[in-house]
Amino acid sequence: RDRFNGDKTFTVGFDYEKYNEIDYAKALSDKIKIDNYSKLVSSEEYWAAIPKIQYHMDEPLADPAAIALYFVSQTAAKHVKVAMSGEGADEFFGGYNIYREPLDLAEFQKLPKGLRKGLANIANAIPFKFKGKSFLNRASKTVEERFIGNAFMFNEKERARILKNPTGKYDHKELTKPFYDKVADKDDVTKMQYIDINFWLIGDILLKADKMSMAHSLEVRVPFLDKEVFNVARTIPTKYKVNKSNTKYAMRQAAHRHLPDMVAEKKKLGFPVPIRIWLKDEKYYNMIKKAFTSEAAEKYFNTDEIVKYLDDHKEGKTDNSRKIWTIYMFLVWYEDFFGNGVKEPVSYTHLTLPTT
């Protein structure tokens, strides 16, 4: 705080308590004597902005937080030209809850691999879901087999079912193996961090931060990605990054020196968006269903299958929100660039050059 000369913070939230940290951000800003500017984003605003946001994204990105970043950048751009953001802290200092998984699986993975595989096969043979099924499945695999970061969405069977022209058999390990090989001598948490730094951080976190801020001509700086910060982070033992009770342990201990305890110990929330709630609303269900039965959808998808994702989610049978969102973002992007979607006006400045 002594070296930070910023005097403003920016926050957005949504009309659900679980998805709204505006009051918390304001309280913290007051505590450290910084002005806070916030915006409560309505569901109508959020959904209306999607085509324009996908236009600015240039490529289909199925991360609902990109739209939240669009609105927080819009809010910030009204007051500043340059802003600092926290991208990179989770990847460097162990902030994602999934990094605690190796600790949770440790005892089970002491069993012989054949036994673990056998238990997982038995669990998978049971046609209905039950508590512990996913645990047995993941615990039967090595970290190299089970972890590709947040990018995993559809398995091979699902792809074959929903796509009209599915790609050939593809093993994600072909993509991640060269990176896992570079950290073969490291512990599982470090391996997961390395995968996220090379895939999730580059392909999602920084991509959406750059595109959404640039949509408002806002320059975003990411101090956690300074090479000196990385050189510190890489020396921190894993036990000081994650433990069974929390994440970013070392970073939280440092935060205690400068921030209130409630901040230093706050559980990670991320940038959550109430997509799974909205998809059960009749208005947004119908909006998605229209896209899922469109001409573009018919071109690439077996529409009965993707509508089933939507129906099952609405009826509460399973949480298909990420799968639905992934397909919908592709269709919105496709309509933007190959259909009759939003087209941003382009202004041209004509220069008259002196003749020599």
Where are the regions a protein language model picked out?
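Conserved S-adenosyl-L-methionine
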Residues: 2-7
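Short beta-strand segments
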Residues: 8-13, 38-40, 84-85, 329
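A conserved beta-strand->alpha-helix junction
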Residues: 15, 22-56, 172-175
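Short, solvent-exposed loop/turn segments at secondary-structure junctions
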Residues: 15-17, 44-45, 89-91, 98-99, ...
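Short, polar/flexible loop-turn hinges at active-site or ligand-entry regions and domain interfaces
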Residues: 37, 58-62, 104-110, 239-243
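Adenosyl-5′-phosphate
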Residues: 65, 78, 82-84, 134-351
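Active-site adenylate/phosphate-handling loop in enzymes that bind or generate adenylated species
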Residues: 71-130, 187, 200, 205-229
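A short, hydrophobic C-terminal helix/tail in secreted or cell-surface proteins
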Residues: 352-356
